[in-house]
């Protein structure tokens, strides 16, 4: 049923429940009738360049750069603020080498070489949107993390919400099976069981990371864990040392999923309460998401390339109030793998 709406009649509910995807592969079944052929991200010849400047070279039509805050850029598009970082600094910590190449059609390739020879290769389009990301192991085996289909590879030309082409989400499961509140988790196994579930509806195609970040409608295709057990102080993105242990349950679930599929991608979302300026809250929420991702890497050895972070400020309040509210100062986690990579690439 639609969240907050009246329950449907039982026969209709059963019919829709039968259409719920039973796996990631089933969710992507309509995306393409042909097997996905993924070419190597390093096969295309590129020209070595210096590290790109922090400033974005171009901004899509309809988007306006509003401010730079703590090495983050805040844009306004369609009367909505959005924050992003020009590069994911978490990826290059302790790297043996990092280099950049210019590719045809105004694209750039970033290669991060780890001490053991593993390479993280990311291709961005002219706006900086991630359209390909692959982890290449020392034995040259490639693990696809992000893959935008060729039909859309060069068409991610503007910041248009792909969710505008979809009807409202018609949720066919109880909300408790769609959003897991960490505060009520008694058995850590619940984290794994929850994250392992497929999307709640069909995935029309694979999306770029930035399309997923910017579109609530696309993100809502997958389930969400609200980590409201991590208590952020007002105005702070720092995780108190006493709170880090609370990440253990979800970290173990992520480790288990990554052992089964090293190509998993998790989105860490940051949120704030409604106190303060909207732009400042956006930057703070992004820092909170990054703080959790960093802790998951430093303490629990979750590889940084398997996590994406995004702050949403006060856009999605858990408790509708303009007053200080600890429950709104939170992070959330989704497994977005079936949204950004073909299932066949990880099997």
Where are these regions (language model features)?
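N-proximal, low-complexity, solvent-exposed accessory regions that precede a main structured/catalytic
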Residues: 1-98, 139-200, 204-205, 209-211, ...
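Extracytoplasmic
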Residues: 60, 68-70, 78, 105, ...
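Soluble periplasmic/extracytoplasmic beta-strand elements of cell-envelope proteins
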Residues: 72-76, 82-84, 109-111, 120-124, ...
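Solvent-exposed coil/turn segments that connect beta secondary-structure elements
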Residues: 78-80, 88, 115-117, 124-128, ...
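Conserved nucleotide-binding/hydrolysis modules and their immediate coupling elements
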Residues: 90, 94, 98-118
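Generic structural signal for well-ordered beta-strand positions
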Residues: 131-132, 143
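Periplasmic peptidoglycan-binding/anchoring modules of Gram-negative envelope and division proteins
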Residues: 209-220, 225, 232-269, 293-298, ...
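Periplasmic OmpA-like peptidoglycan-binding domain that tethers envelope proteins to the cell wall
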Residues: 242-244, 264, 271-347
């Amino acid at each position: 049923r639609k969240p907050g709406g009246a329950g449907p009649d039982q026969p209709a509910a059963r019919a829709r429940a039968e259409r719920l995807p039973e796996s990631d592969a089933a969710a992507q079944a309509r995306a393409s009738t042909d097997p996905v052929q993924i070419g190597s991200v390093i096969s295309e010849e590129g020209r070595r360049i210096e590290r790109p400047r922090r400033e974005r070279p171009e901004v899509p039509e309809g988007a306006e750069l509003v401010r730079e805050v703590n090495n983050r850029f805040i844009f306004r598009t369609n009367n909505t603020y959005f924050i992003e970082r020009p590069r994911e600094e978490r990826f290059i910590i302790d790297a043996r080498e990092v280099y950049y190449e210019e590719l045809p059609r105004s694209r750039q390739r970033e290669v991060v070489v780890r001490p053991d020879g593993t390479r993280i290769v990311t291709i961005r389009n002219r706006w900086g949107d991630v359209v390909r990301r692959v982890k290449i192991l020392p034995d040259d085996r490639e693990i696809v993390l992000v893959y935008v289909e060729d039909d859309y590879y060069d068409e991610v030309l503007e910041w248009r919400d792909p969710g505008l082409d979809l009807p409202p989400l018609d949720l066919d499961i109880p909300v408790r099976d769609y959003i897991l509140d960490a505060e009520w988790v008694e058995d850590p196994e619940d984290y794994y069981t929850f994250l392992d579930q497929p999307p709640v509806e069909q995935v029309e195609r694979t999306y770029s990371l930035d399309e997923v970040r910017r579109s609530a409608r696309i993100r809502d295709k997958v389930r969400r864990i609200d980590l409201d057990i991590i208590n952020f102080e007002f105005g702070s993105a720092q995780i108190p040392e006493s709170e880090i242990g609370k990440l253990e349950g979800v970290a173990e679930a992520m480790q288990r999923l990554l052992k089964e599929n090293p190509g998993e991608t998790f989105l860490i979302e940051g949120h704030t309460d409604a106190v303060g300026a909207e732009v400042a809250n956006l930057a703070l929420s992004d820092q909170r998401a990054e703080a959790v991702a960093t802790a998951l890497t430093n303490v629990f050895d979750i590889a940084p390339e398997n996590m994406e972070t995004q702050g949403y400020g006060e856009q999605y309040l858990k408790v509708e109030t303009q007053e200080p509210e600890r429950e709104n100062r939170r992070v959330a986690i989704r497994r977005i793998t079936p949204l950004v990579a073909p299932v066949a690439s990880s099997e």
